[in-house]
Amino acid sequence: MTDHNLLPEPKKILWRVSELNRNARVILEQTFPLLWVSGEISNLKRYPSGHWYFSLKDDSAQVRCVMFRHKNLYLDWIPQEGMQVEAQALVTLYEARGEFQLTVEQLRRAGLGALFEAFERLKARLQQEGLFSPEYKQPLPRFPRQIGIITSPNTAALRDVLTTLQLRLPSIPVVIYPAPVQGEGSAAAITTALHTAAVRGECDVLILCRGGGSIEDLWAFNEEIVARAIAACPIPIVTGIGHETDFTIADFVADARAPTPTGAAQLASPDRQAILHRLQYWLHRLQQTMERHIERRMQATDLLAHRLIHPGERIRHQQMHLLQLRGRLQNAWNRQVEIRTWRIEETGRRIHSAKPDIQAGIRHQQELAARLQRAMAHRLENLQFKLRQQQQHLIHLDPKAVLARGYSIAYTARGDILHDSRQTRAGDNVRLVFASGWAKADITETGE
């Protein structure tokens, strides 16, 4: 018979409370995935920190829950005591007290799960059909001639859109296609408004918008008939539905999506200030480009003018300059005539008011006209005289005039002009050009 008191006892593991709670928390979090739990809210407390503490219960049990501020901020509704909800949560243990609890990630009213499932099914089907594909998206016009708005009248969303359009570019006309955006029949009304806008074809872009709300409030924009009406519309559509965190089927099908109605108005309309700044920028660039182009042309013209040595070209330039001077002279003449005419009329008025000798005034007028005629004729004669001098000077510079005085030009066999006796040697052939005709010669001797 064995004496159990003599057997060695197994080694005992002694856990500290904190170690036990920590290991239990790890086991819970690793064992249970992120899951959905339904129940009734009770003992709801909202702390100044923004965190929410409550219990979820059913007929036979309850569990403690916490939803931290950075999670509950995204809710567009406020939970109330006794409300039936569905919570997506992580199963865990509050180590400090050893309390089993749920850390809630998302919270929705009971029954919305079916809506989310319907949303995901329709989204997947339309995506498979290609309604969300980028190649089907129409580009938004940069400068729309008219903008259409599809929303419910007398709403904050409509006021926000109209205010934004007025601030950005008040000259753009706006057409409102009224349609209820919430409740029974709203999806059909939105579809009708889209069809009306497409048939009338009076707008270059459409804004489909409404303010924030729950998933039920926004459900009209998740209906298939609305999605297909958007896809079939030949006019580009910008959606601005709810808040930044709200996404609807209409947002995925539309040509562009904005987080709010105000953002949709900004996407659909050009900014007047941005246009003005852009125009000023391009005007400045154009001015700089033109100035540089003119400067380059002026430099090229100066270079070409410097290289031109033919007297005929210089004569033509002088003739063009003379024509310019004639034009300026004619303009000056016209201005002087206008000035003299005004002075004569003014003198006539003075004569009429002072009752002087009319004949003396007429003689003064005739004298002024004669003096002006003589001055202009003298000026024109001087300009013509200078032109003749320039022409005569250029004629004297013509190489042919030098040849006419008995000189000749000698060319080598390659056609180069001979400037120096060292360019040739005895036995070379040269060509002599005279004022009239030419002759060949043989070099018999060279010297310096």
Curated annotation (Swiss-Prot):
Keywords: Cytoplasm, Exonuclease, Hydrolase, Nuclease. One of its GO terms (biological process) is DNA catabolic process. Pfam families: Exonuc_VII_L (PF02601), tRNA_anti_2 (PF13742). InterPro entries: Exonuc_VII_L, Exonuc_VII_lsu_C, OB-fold_nuc-bd_dom. CDD domains: ExoVII_LU_OBF. It catalyses: Exonucleolytic cleavage in either 5'- to 3'- or 3'- to 5'-direction to yield nucleoside 5'-phosphates. It is found in: Cytoplasm. Bidirectionally degrades single-stranded DNA into large acid-insoluble oligonucleotides, which are then degraded further into small acid-soluble oligonucleotides. This is Exodeoxyribonuclease 7 large subunit. The gene is xseA.
